[in-house]
Structures are given as structure tokens and as C-alpha cells.
Amino acid sequence: MKTQLIILLFSLTLNQQNSILIDFGKEKKGRYWNVVNDGVMGGLSKGGKKITKNSLLFMGEVSLDNNGGFSSLRKSFSEVDISNFSDVEIRYRSSGISFAFSLAVSRRWYVPNYKISLESTSSEWKTTIFKLTDLRKHYIGKALNDRLKKETLKDIIRIGFITDQKKYGEFEFELDYIKFK
């Protein structure tokens, strides 16, 4: 019996190290996420979130007025070491404007972050998997040539999503889960 317990505990530890799951349905992780719109710089875009039975729904409207043009959904700041992982899997659906998955290494808005675009799904659920090293460095919305380096994955302090085009329009973006593996 003691041996079985040790094996069970060891396998649970291995599973925890093999992936990190952010579940917006069953575990309701959406309460730790916040909406940030371009109002922080004078824009007039609107965005909101709603925790549903099985997901986190992010919806709103991007406005280009007053030099605006984005709405974002971001996890609260917290250190996340994802250096043991090479891939991220996201189950989502969207309509309207396209989105990007983003990782930040600084609290300062002017320090570059890393993004990768997500395909629009026409409101159909989609599961997408990509390499973390495929994320590209961006500086205030402009893509740079650098890709995310493996050693930078230990320095992540924020995970998020942002409208990926400076384009007017309504949007819905619904998340089931994010899994680092």
C-alpha cells in the first residue's frame, strides 16, 4: 500500500510538471483576468469580460477615435516560469476582429512583449498548438525580427490576448483553456 501511494504521488508530481493548465470553464480562472482598453492612452475602445459556465467571454468594440485601436484581456501580474515547456495549446472561438496571444516580461508598457496571431474561427471552437519560440517580439504594436528565446520563458510575468489589428469593429473572443506543455 505504501509503495502504491508513493507511485501515485510521483505520477501526480510528474503530471504537474509536464503541463500547466489554465482552465476557464471548470476552474473559473477568468476571475484573475482583467480587460485593458486603449483608454489608458486616450482611445475610446470598449471591452468587457463575462465568466460563463464553461468559458471566459471577452467582448467589445475597437474604436480608432482619439488614436485608439486595441482592447486586451490580461492575467494579473504574476511570475510564471514556463521554461520547462515548448508548446502552448489554446482552445478558443472568435468572431469579428483577429486576436493575438501575448506574453510580457515587464510591467512597463513600453518594454517589448511577445505575440503570435490567432486565426479567426467564425464562432466555431478551435484548438491550436504552437511553439513558444514562434512568438515574435513587438514594440508598441510593431513586429520586430526577434523571436522569443527559450531562456526568456523563465521571466514571463503576464499572459494575455489583444486585438491584433488596428481596425474598427465589434468582437467576441471566448476561451476554454490555455495549456503550456
Regions found by a protein language model. Name each.
Residues 1-19:
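Bacterial Sec-dependent N-terminal signal peptides
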Residues 16-181:
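Beta-rich carbohydrate-recognition modules and glycan-binding surfaces
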